[in-house]
Curated annotation (Swiss-Prot):
One of its GO terms (molecular function) is 2-hydroxyglutarate dehydrogenase activity. Its cofactor is FAD. Its EC number is 1.1.5.4. GO terms for biological process: tricarboxylic acid cycle. It comes from Bacillus anthracis. Pathway: Carbohydrate metabolism; tricarboxylic acid cycle; oxaloacetate from (S)-malate (quinone route): step 1/1. This is Probable malate:quinone oxidoreductase. The lineage of its organism: Bacteria, Bacillati, Bacillota, Bacilli, Bacillales.
Amino acid sequence: MSNMQQKTDVILIGAGIMSATLGSLLKELAPEWEIKVFEKLASAGEESSNEWNNAGTGHSALCELNYTSEKSDGSIDISKAVKVNEQFQLSRQFWAYLVKSKLIRNPQDFIMPLPHMSLVQGEKNVEFLKNRFEALSKNPLFQGMEFSDAPETLKKWLPLIMEGRTSNEPMAATKIDSGTDVNFGALTRMLFDYLKTKDVELNYKHSVENIKRTKNGLWEVKVHDMNSGKIEHHTAKFVFIGGGGGSLPLLQKTGIPESKHIGGFPVSGLFMVCKNQKVVEQHHAKVYGKAKVGAPPMSVPHLDTRYIDNKKALLFGPFAGFSPKFLKTGSNLDLIGSVKPNNVLTMLAAGVKEMGLTKYLIQQVMLSHEKRMEELREFIPNAKSEDWDIVVAGQRVQVIKDTDAGGKGTLQFGTEVVSAADGSIAALLGASPGASTAVHVMLEVLEKCFPSRMVEWEGKIKEMIPSYGISLTENPRLFQDLHTSTGRTLGLNEKETVHN
C-alpha cells in the first residue's frame, strides 16, 4: 500500500472491548457505513481487554464497597452503586441481543454466573456492611442479597477463607448469587469475528502515528503498517480512539481544545494466581474486601474465581506497580512524552496533591513475594507460598484534569469520553469500571457524536437494549423481566441454581 489517501466513514483505533462494542452498535444501526479498525498488536483484545490483564468482574456494585460511601450521619450513599449496576444491565442486554440474534455464540465462553460477596473485619466495618446491605436491599437491582455475621454461615459461604482462622475479631459478609465473571478478551474476539463477517476491515500490526484535521473537515490518520514497513494515510468522517492507555497521546495529537489540560498517570496491576487446583476448587465467588484507610480505590483487595479458557482459576490482588509505560506493550517514554505545555501545571498540581498515592505505589513496588503472601493470608490464613505465582496484569492510565470540585490536577478514577465539539472525533480515557460499562459508554459516544441520528436510531437501540433511557430502579417489573430473559439467553439462570 502506498502513501495515497484512502477514505472511509469510520475509523476505530484499538481492537479492544470499546472499539468492538462501538463497531457492533454502528453495524446494527448504520450497516451501510464503512468501518476500518487499526490495532498495533497482532490480534484483538490483547491489551487491557485481555482476560489476564483485568479482574474479569462484571462490575455491578454487588460487592465492590468503594461504590457505596458512608455519609457524615452514618447513612449510606448508594447512588454510585445504582448507577454502575444500571450501566452493567445495558451491557448484559446488548450481549443477550447479540446471542439471541446469533451474531455471537456460546455465551458460556465469555460470561459465567458467580456469587459476588463483600467481606469485612472489625466492629466498625461490620456495622458499615450491615448498613450498606440494608440500604441496597431496598433497591430492586440488589434483590437477593444476603447478610451474615454468623461464623457458621460464613464457614459455609467461604470455606477457604474461614479455614484456619484464629482471630476473634468480628467478621461479616454479604452474598448475592446473580454476580458474573466476564472474560472480556474472549468477548472482544467474538465481537471482532462478527464484525469481520459484516465487512469491517480489521488491520492488525498497524500502529497509528498521527491524527490531524484536513481542510475539508475530515480526519486524516497516519498509520504505520508494521507488516510491510509502509506508511498509509486514511481519512474518515468519524474517528474513535479506543486505545486504552495509548488513547491520551493520540488524543493530544488531534489538537482539539477538549484535549488540553488533561494528563495521565500510569498504574500497573499485579495479581497472585493459584497453581494448586485443589485450592482453586475450594472457592467459588468473587470476594471483595475493604481498601485500607488512605489507600486509593484501585487497591481494594479481592479473591476471585475466574473462568479462563473454560478452566476455573483463582486470583488474588490487585497489587500496584509502577511503570512509565501507558500500555503493557508501550514505551518507557510514554509518561514524559505526554507532558505538554498545556498540561504541565495540571500534572505538577496532581503530583503535589497525590503524595499519598505516590507513597502507596512506592510501598507496593517494594513488596517481596512473602509480603504479598502476608496480605493474601488476611483472606486465606492457610495459604502456602509454593501454591501462588505472580502475574503482571494490564496498565491503567488514571486521568488527571482540572475540575471545579477538586481544583487543578485532580486524579479521576472513572471512565471518561472526551469528544470534539462537532462530534467528529472521540476518545475513551480512564480505568474502572471500564469494560463492564462498555455499552453505556459507547451509547454516550453515539449521543455526543451523532445527536442528529439518535431519533432515527432510537427504535433499533431499544430493540437491542430495552432499558435504554429508562431507570430500572424506578421500573422494578421491567428489571425483573429483563434480568430473567437475559439470564436465560446468556445461560446464567440455570447455572446460578446449580452453584447455590
